[in-house]
Amino acid sequence: MNVSTAGKWSGPALAVLGLLVAGAMALTPAAGRSTLIWWILSSALAPERVLPLIGLGAALALVDRRYSLGALALFGGGVAVGFFGKDWLLSVLAAIPRATSHHFLTGPISSVTVGVALVLPTARLRSWFLLIAAALAGCMLAIAIAVTDPSLHDVAIPLAGVVVGFWIVVAISLTVRTFWRTWFPIPARILGSWLVAIGLLYGGASLIPKQKSAFPLPAESTPNIIPFPGPDRLSPEFQPHERPGAVIPPADLQQP
């Protein structure tokens, strides 16, 4: 196997290798999982995190290699900006209503931006917008890693999140290039429209406040007591009877 053949199949090999590692993590007994493995399975590989990265990888395969490498570099730069400018970015995103309870809407923002890059009609417009989408997706990935990090100080978790993100983008991009067909832009636009729709629906649902119940709940201090019916409302078998004993005779029968 020569170098060109090995490079051609590097994408599928990278994808299979990553899937095997993820499968081994998923098969690990829950009691034996470390914090890192638990975080990778529950956060780094969460659908809202993976879908925009899959779309970004597909978008990189649709453009010229020069733009693809530039977008990948901007993706890495966006990750760095997201980590070092985390406090400022969080303060900006916190202005969005209810963003703090939905990971600062990092998933919807990435999905919509990458989806737009996929559905743009012309290759030139797609290539230029992809640079912006890649940088923004990198920023959102870094913010998502920071706000879901349970350790707060363990370097392994942010590093693993970045590695997983780059693995998804690069593996998808190289695999699509390996099996490239001229009709690939059609399903890519369908994927982009799905990402835009998912991002808008999820983001819109996150902005809607929870509706209060139309029926007020009873106060806890008010006991639910059913009054016991009086004697006149009891059935005959439950009516009170006089106790047996001496009975006073009528006055006309009493002896003097």
PLM segments and residue spans:
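Short, solvent-exposed mixed-charge patches
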Residues: Q254-P256
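Membrane metalloprotein/metal-transporter helix-bundle signature
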Residues: M1-A251
